[in-house]
Amino acid sequence: LLFYNDYNAADPQKRDRIYNMVKSMKEEGVPIDGIGMQGHYNIYGPSMEDVDAALTKYSTIVKHIHITELDIRANEEMGGHLNFSREAGDISQTVKLLQEDQYTRLFKILRKHKDVVDNVTFWNLSDRDSWVGVRNYPLPYDENYKPKRVYSLIKDFDPAADNAVVKEDFRPSVLNQPGQQYPMVNSQGYARFRVVAPDAKSVIVSLGLGGRGGTVLRKDKEGV
């Protein structure tokens, strides 16, 4: 199979350029079978909405999409500002949760497009051998080649959760104080919170998990 492989392939502007170029080449008879999307991501970017949109658009012109060079580093640095740390160091539980959430959201989208996404290649096996170094914590295995929690989140996913339908019959919790609207719960046991954090990129809600996990709430492009 012949692939066109590129970086930043989820960026909306570059996505359109790649789409137009590959479409034009195929119309001229170039036998391109698929598109490769290099996956050097971080805990905040790209947005999974952009990844989803790119997969949707590319799938209209090719039958195969590969995610190549996948890693999700624990920072936002890019290009010449990227910190290539080779020394092991501590990483906060918050950053771990953000990375786990980004990996989980990514693979949920990849499963959504499973008819066209037929390969995912990680850019090395463990943090020890990563091109960005162990302190960037980018891969499913740690510096001692032990699987991290994110490995299980990728491998042992719940298929039912991918297409869960949440009922909108939310009511204030019976444990709320008089006049308190949030948190709200529905008949399925889902909870809804109202969080005011105008300067935050994300908020982690952890209930009774003892710091071992949590739900990451991320702002959309409108800041909500």
What are the functions of these language-model segments?
Residues 46-66, 70-162:
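Aromatic-rich peripheral "rim/lid" segments of glycoside hydrolase catalytic domains that contact
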Residues 1-82:
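Noncatalytic carbohydrate-binding groove/subsite architecture in carbohydrate-active enzymes
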Residues 15, 77-78, 132, 205-208:
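Short, solvent-exposed loop/turn and secondary-structure capping segments
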Residues 162-178:
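A general sequence property marking short-to-moderate contiguous segments
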Residues 194-224:
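Aromatic-rich carbohydrate-binding modules that target alpha-glucans
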Residues 180-185:
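Short beta-strand segments of immunoglobulin-like
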